[in-house]
């Protein structure tokens, strides 16, 4: 199954057609936090998505934060649509207009990493996704 998900990667919030959450991310390393809400498990580490807000990053590819927030947004959108957690995803990514032309190719490569499928857990549900187009 292949689906299209539009994601606006804003400085303040991550937005899809059916959800919006603050663009904050807290890392707990290898220690599971007290909450399951917004909990992302990826690469052996725990992150809480939507907690607070990050400082504005002119280049959103300098660390993994926006990649991890993208995985959370995909999981939330799949859950809202009632779709299976194993699928191929085409992302329609939104960037700020001021940097769209400059950052588009770099952001596309950033999201389309070579490790496919992407396996992770979000709020206790296991996902196995192939990101096939940005």
Question: Which positions does each model-derived feature cover?
Answer:
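Nucleotide/phosphate-binding catalytic cleft detector across ATP-hydrolyzing
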Residues: 1-132
């Amino acid at each position: 199954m292949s689906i299209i998900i539009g994601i606006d990667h804003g400085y303040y919030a991550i937005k899809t057609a059916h959800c919006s959450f603050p663009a904050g991310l807290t890392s707990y390393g290898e220690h599971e936090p007290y909450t399951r809400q917004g909990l992302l498990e990826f690469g052996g580490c725990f992150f809480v998505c939507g907690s607070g807000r990050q400082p504005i990053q002119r280049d959103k590819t300098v660390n993994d934060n926006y990649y991890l927030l993208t995985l959370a947004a995909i999981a939330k959108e799949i859950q809202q649509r009632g779709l299976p957690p194993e699928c191929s995803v085409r992302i329609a990514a939104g960037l700020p207009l001021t940097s769209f032309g400059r950052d588009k190719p770099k952001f596309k490569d950033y999201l389309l990493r070579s490790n496919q499928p992407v396996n992770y857990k979000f709020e206790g549900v296991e996902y196995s996704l192939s990101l096939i187009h940005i």
